[in-house]
Amino acid sequence: LNEQCLLIKKYAKNQWVTTNYIPNYDEGHIGGSPSLDFQSYTRYMVYGDNEGIGRRGYRVGNPLRIAWANDFFRPIQGTYGVMELQPGQVNWGSINPQPLPGAVRLWMWSVFAGGSDFICTYRYRQPLYGTEQYHYGIVGTDGVTVTPGGREYETFIKEIRELRKHSSSRETKPADYLARRTAILFNHENSWSIERQKQNRTWDTFAHIEKYYRTLKSFGAPVDFISEAKNLSDYPVVIAPTYQLADKELVDKWITYVKNGGNLILTCRTAQKDRYGRLPEAPFGSMITPLTGNEMNFYDLLLPENPGTVVMDGKEYIWNTWGEILNPPADAQVWATYKNEFYEGSPAVTFRKLGKGTITYVGVDSHNGALEKDILKKLYVQLNIPVMDLPYGCLLYTSPSP
């Protein structure tokens, strides 16, 4: 793709070039073409799944699908947009219902709120022949009649014009909002490595990451998915969920970030392999011992029909996919322990101050994300970072001027 971009620019020097990525984050191509002038993605929300909220949620879609894409694409170059946003009913899903009235407009506002610079749709007119005859456009088969989705595009355009009259180009973002700014460190190769050796059929790498991301969005936190090339010091808090592939250079970068005042959260399966997917000739999981102080006695995997329990602050949480039995140093706090099995009472979650910052290690993956949410709540309280408690599906952004 990068070579194609360079070839186009060779002959069309004044033409900008982008592409409409499908946000399949684990495939590794997003952000891999630095010659693109800006990033863009495609997003369809209603196509037969049932990930929305409530009985009719399938008519709106998963409320984090656009948010996650915004937070993933925006940090790459800053300038980004949506090249394909669903205009209405589509043809290619397993079941293709009508979107709920207002859904298209909601999607457009969600894209804009995340900092997008443009929104396009596919397509303008519903086709008369071909494989996508039943795919809506802005206008219908007569080329004149505006479809329901087209009317919502019309409404959004009017609203955004009105909003411009009331906006300021130099509006200051609230201090409490900026204090919550958090990065999620992401490398698709971690997913490649783990998904090929899951060790537990119930393990899901992206479901694990979402437990942290969903919590951050409920906090009203601005979130960036970033690569290792980014400056960690730009963020008060950095989470590296299940970051399996690592090396000394990366661990040293984490240590420097923490010692200089950063607050790092690492989760289970982190730094267990080197960059080539090999287990180091050293105690298992010891690559991050200089950072966390922990030694790993062993890890356990339970049957889903016979899960285990973790306890933190008197509250119990269910787990089965992955649990690490830790041996923490004297200067670490134990935040959560295992309640049952032959390692009952052993640490599962630790917290340690290092230099001017902190390192939290979460060695277990809970069933529903309740443990992960309470850990982040506990941490942000200790850091005096104010958080919100937004219901699922309600997202907070402070956006640049339209």
Where are these regions (language model features)?
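Short, well-ordered secondary-structure micro-motifs within conserved domains or adaptor modules
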Residues: 233-244
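Active-site neighborhood of glycoside hydrolase catalytic domains
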Residues: 1-17
